[in-house]
């Protein structure tokens, strides 16, 4: 199972994130979407998570990827 970051209402996915400039690029081709590790998302319902992009983090003993800040983006499982 892959984890992608998808627009809540459109068929577009995050393709890449440039952390230096803050630019996020999107694609409508699911095969070009950035895939994230699924361990952090394993216990979450995709509709409850809002996303910006993912970056490594460690908090409260959990290691994984942190997502936040753009409500129209959601975690999407394939």
Predicted ranges, named:
Residues 1, 21, 59-63:
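Feature targets compositionally biased, intrinsically disordered low-complexity regions
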Residues 34-78:
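Short, mixed-charge low-complexity intrinsically disordered segments
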Residues 2-29:
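Short aromatic-glycine-(Arg/Gly/Cys) micro-motifs in beta-strand/loop hairpins
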């Amino acid at each position: 199972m892959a984890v992608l970051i998808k627009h809540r209402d459109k068929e577009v996915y995050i393709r890449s994130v440039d952390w230096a400039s803050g630019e996020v690029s999107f694609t409508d081709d699911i095969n070009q979407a950035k895939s994230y590790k699924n361990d952090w998302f394993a216990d979450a319902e995709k509709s409850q998570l809002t996303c910006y992009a993912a970056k490594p983090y460690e908090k409260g003993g959990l290691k994984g990827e942190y997502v936040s800040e753009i409500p129209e983006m959601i975690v999407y499982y394939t």
